Amino acid sequence: MRLRMRKGSPRSSHVAAVRTARCKRKHSEEDEEEESPLIEEDKLPKQETGLLSTIKNFIKGSTNKEDRENPAKRSKVERDLDNNLITSTPRTGDKPSKPIARVRRKSQVNGEATAYEVSQHMKQNGKLEDLPCTTSPPRTTLLGTIFSPVFNFFSPANKNGTSGSDSPGQAVEAEEIVKQLDMEKVDEFSTSTATNGASYPSLGAPVRSTAGSWLEGTEDTPERDIPPLTAPVSPESGYSSAHAEAAYEEDWEVFDPYFFIKHVPPLTEEQLNRKPALPLKTRSTPEFSLVLDLDETLVHCSLNELEDAALTFPVLFQDVIYQVYVRLRPFFREFLERMSQIYEIILFTASKKVYADKLLNILDPKKRLVRHRLFREHCVCVQGNYIKDLNILGRDLSKTIIIDNSPQAFAYQLSNGIPIESWFMDKNDKELLKLVPFLENLVELNEDVRPHVRDRFRLHDCLPPD
């Protein structure tokens, strides 16, 4: 019996052919994907549509879309490097580092402390590692910052300033002043009343003056206290014709306050017209005013740890915390309590307010002894030196006295000034007590104080001859 093969309908054969073609096309696409699995990063895959693609996306998730909307987090190093574009603090190297302010309290000049900033970053183990800072300029010294600055001659190194300004635009006028000094015809002399003794080189200034400050350098200084730079000198030991005829050695190591006073330029019109910094007197205010310096006149402060310090306090200056140790001059409080009853006590210092004001808040928190406080911003800057022009007080100068260990500080009112020996640590010092009888007598006389001060201390006799 012969079996006959049944032929399929044309429609069924057409459907089978279509299925076969689809399978071939599918396999060929898979082969192409295996042969070239990598695609260009900028080409996006074709997005499928329809119910089937929706189910696939729901199960697998749209990774490409998530990658575009939520890119991978950057590392901390990458973020810090980008932040260098907006930060105001320059960083060293490519590796981010956290600067840490450190205070070093070892010193080399006259036993006084120094402070400087060390750029460091934290290791992974938590220890500090020094990094040399090549982009940041070195921090300026404390010389002329927190404490009273050092006074300078009108030396060639300081030609760029003029009265009231230390800008480089006035160099010509400063040169003329230097020429007028005629240094070759002046004898080298030891400083009197305020600067007698050996010279002490300072950091960044040609001389060490009596202008109060000691620890203002940022270099290491030897661990010993400053010996007094002042000694009482009789007015008769002033200048003579023999001194003027002798040769002066231009070593710039000895600072004479009276030579400075002799050649100080006059006040400018702007400085003469400054508004008074103090309020008007009240009925309870004493008639006479007594202006007192701070550093080396009433106290001695240091960044070195002082075993005999009467008090200590921190000072924040230029983002660095400094620990200040304070010695009080003998009879400091007794002098203030006695003088505050008959004088309007005014503190006038060339130190920074951030330091001096905090110290006075500790010593006299209720302002019972010192009625007013003036700081460096109230001084007149002359050739880079700060001078205390008493006109800024707004007080009658015939009834105003200033006591300062630096006579050059009251260069513009020499007849109002009483020099006092600089004090550092002498526990037997009685200079404040010695002034009490004279000051009380001035109030009792109720006269112009200037002739009495001039006759008593004769500072004009210490000025060099013309």
UniProtKB/Swiss-Prot annotation:
Record's compositionally biased regions (Acidic residues): 30-39
InterPro entries: Dullard_phosphatase, FCP1_dom, HAD-like_sf, HAD_sf, TIM50
Keywords: Hydrolase, Protein phosphatase
One Pfam family this sequence matches: NIF
Compositionally biased spans, kind Basic and acidic residues: 63-82
EC number, as in UniProt: 3.1.3.-
Keyword Hydrolase: yes
SUPFAM superfamilies recorded: HAD-like
GO molecular function, one term: phosphoprotein phosphatase activity
Superkingdom of the source species: Eukaryota
The protein's enzyme class: hydrolase
Residue stretches making up the FCP1 homology domain: 283-442
Disordered: annotated span: 1-111, 189-238
Biased composition (Polar residues): 50-62, 189-199
NCBIfam families named in the record: HIF-SF_euk
Summary of the function given for this chain in its UniProt record: Probable phosphatase.
Family per record: Belongs to the CTDSPL2 family.
Designated name of the protein: CTD small phosphatase-like protein 2-A
Species in which this protein is naturally found: Xenopus laevis (African clawed frog)
Gene: ctdspl2-a
